[in-house]
Amino acid sequence: MKFAEHLSAHITPEWRKQYIQYEAFKDMLYSAQDQAPSVEVTDEDTVKRYFAKFEEKFFQTCEKELAKINTFYSEKLAEAQRRFATLQNELQSSLDAQKESTGVTTLRQRRMPVFHLSHEERVQHRNIKDLKLAFSEFYLSLILLQNYQNLNFTEFRKILKKHDKILETSRGADWRVAHVEVAPFYTCKKINQLISETEAVVTNELEDGDPQKAMKRLRVPSLGAAQPAPAWTTFRVGLFCGIFIVLNITLVLAAVFKLETDRSIWPLIRIYRGGFLLIEFLFLLGINTYGWRQAGVNHVLIFELNPRNNLSHQHLFEIAGFLGILWCLSLLACFFAPISVIPTYVYPLVLYGFMVFFLINPTKTFYYKSRFWLLKLLFRVFTAPFHKVGFADFWLADQLNSLSVILMDLEYMICFYSFELKWDESGGLLPNNSEEPEICHKYSYGVRAIVQCVPAWLRFIQCLRRYRDTKRAFPHLVNAGKYSTTFFTVTFAALYSTHKERGHSDTMVFFYLWIVFCIISSCYTLIWDLKMDWGLFDKNAGENTFLREEIVYPQRAYYYCTIIEDVILRFAWTVQISITSMTLLPHSGDIIATVFAPLEVFRRFVWNFFRLENEHLNNCGEFRAVRDISVAPLNADDQTLLEQMMDQDDGVRDRQKNRPWKYSQSISLRRPRLASQSKARDTKVLIEDTDDEANT
């Protein structure tokens, strides 16, 4: 592997700007070599003056980069020292409180089950659990800083060695000895001391003096390129996907040759449509995960997942393929139910019952930690007013807005099994066309409209909760207004449908109101997608016209195509309304809804790429590379200690003014400036695609 590829794979993406501009230095050296005057046409003194002038500029740039690295390292080291003092203080407070309440001298002597503890003891137990997680994340941040230290030294050594090789001199090596090897970022070994002290604290105080158990908890995921998935996982993904494709072909043939023309297939389609959308969503989420990892978008940090244990794209493909096979087999069984002793209505119950059991399975199998994380997240989403709302909370609620058809089909299935299904007929899911009209697929009884509004309601109350926590009307109240338009759209659609069915004279009034609010909702959401969720149409976009100053994905064409796609699919309802209003084709609304529901899932899949890119750039602007986990707020003692650290000689230093050279594809991340950076200019660096490693 070339060093540039090694560097791209191992850097911390959120700190990308703060590394040495290795590729830029390489371009600088090669350009100087190519533009150097030839000794055949000019005298030797001219050539020497050219290279002397170039070296002066080269080493000045090296000094600026070295000052930048020293400053950033000092800032992060001071932050780590403050964080370690805070964690030690929190740990000591928890241990002291435990001694006072139980008389037990050390944590490892407690062995009572949690449900036997008093309220105060449960709080202390939870604090210790949070401390273990906090020390684990803190240890990861130390390793990242140590990796930053080592990589930058290696980069300096490599680029100065290349300088000497191209210019046939030894001044690069001399400069490295005189400047880099005595630089604070390289000579300071306090990071190693912090790592050792953290290991000792976790071993002695939190893990019963067991070093193996402590290091297992502190284990750092690989900081290099993504590790290949286990061979059996890859095999299962290929096997499941192959079987799924074959079964889909079989389904099409069975539908053509086995279904009777006098039977209505719509109850069957509505019941199985939601399962297909869920499988499509999982598969596309796997592609999202792969794309984020390849582009260096740290989705593990954004969702605050455990970097040591989370699902990769391979696992998501595996789950989607497995559920897809079950979905196909269940639907095929319905087609061939007439020659079976099992009625058709049993198969959907078995399929969805298995899916629910797979999710809530209490045993520690089948991705237990990931399933438990999802269940906790769903609970937080549905109880949004009572919790602070994080990124993962409102991200999942946004996904539910694109999966509202699943909720509506679930409501239809419950209603159909309760009121319309002929339990005494084996082909109950394929009723005769001549039977009495449907009830469950209409708005007339009111429940369907309420179910359709549930996802928008969840996001609406999340926005209100965020306004309560931040007291910021913009963007939270404005965002709540966006989701409130869904309530009006669904309400007028339901009123139009019921009044049209009953032949009321005011039907067209509700139709026009429905159209008006559809236009308002689509324009509102489209503008919010482009400007707020994706951060596009930035006035400081520079060469990235209509986009933003910083872009992560390699081609600007991706962004322009995405804008067009979002406009088309946000206004796809115009096609649906036009066809259903102007045609007498039976079930035209069902046909259009069945076509457009997967397209909405696809639109959300594309939206995910750029929404997380925007959040990732926010993390880059704050240099946030690990989760922020704390048991207690910073107290006065810790604040005093922090101030002392900042006053030390190895604390934060003032940055020197510097203006880096510019390249065609660069980022300049805006962020709140530290006091030490009040007069510093933003640093631009060349972007390379990186794989942000997260073990599974």
Swiss-Prot record:
This is Solute carrier family 53 member 1. Residues 1-228, 297-309, 384-388, 472, 535-553, 627-696 are cytoplasmic. GO terms for molecular function: efflux transmembrane transporter activity; inositol hexakisphosphate binding; phosphate transmembrane transporter activity; virus receptor activity. Residues 439-643 form the EXS domain. The modification Phosphoserine is found at residue 668. InterPro entries: EXS_C, SPX_dom. It comes from the Eukaryota. One of its GO terms (biological process) is cellular response to phosphate starvation. Residues 648-696 are annotated as: Disordered. It is found in: Cell membrane. The lineage of its organism: Eukaryota, Metazoa, Chordata, Craniata, Vertebrata. The keyword Cell membrane applies. Residues 260-264, 338-343, 423-429, 504-506, 586-587 are extracellular. One of its GO terms (cellular component) is Golgi apparatus. The keyword Transmembrane helix applies. It catalyses: phosphate(in) = phosphate(out). The chain crosses the membrane at residues 229-259, 265-296, 310-337, 344-365, 389-422, 430-471, 473-503, 507-534, 554-585, 588-626. Residues 158-165 are annotated as: Important for inositol polyphosphate binding. The SPX domain plays a role in the regulation of phosphate flux. Inositol hexakisphosphate (Ins6P) is bound between two SPX domains of the homodimer. The SPX domain has high affinity for inositol polyphosphates and its affinity for inorganic phosphate is two to three orders of magnitude lower. The record marks 573 as: Gating residue for phosphate transport. Inorganic ion transporter that mediates phosphate ion export across plasma membrane. Plays a major role in phosphate homeostasis, preventing intracellular phosphate accumulation and possible calcium phosphate precipitation, ultimately preserving calcium signaling. Binds inositol hexakisphosphate (Ins6P) and similar inositol polyphosphates, such as 5-diphospho-inositol pentakisphosphate (5-InsP7), which are important intracellular signaling molecules involved in regulation of phosphate flux. It is a multi-pass membrane protein. Belongs to the SYG1 (TC 2.A.94) family. Keywords: Cell membrane, Host cell receptor for virus entry, Membrane, Phosphoprotein, Receptor, Transmembrane, Transmembrane helix. It comes from Neovison vison. Phosphate binds at residues 398, 401, 482-483, 570, 603-604. CDD domains: SPX_XPR1_like. Pfam families: EXS (PF03124), SPX (PF03105).
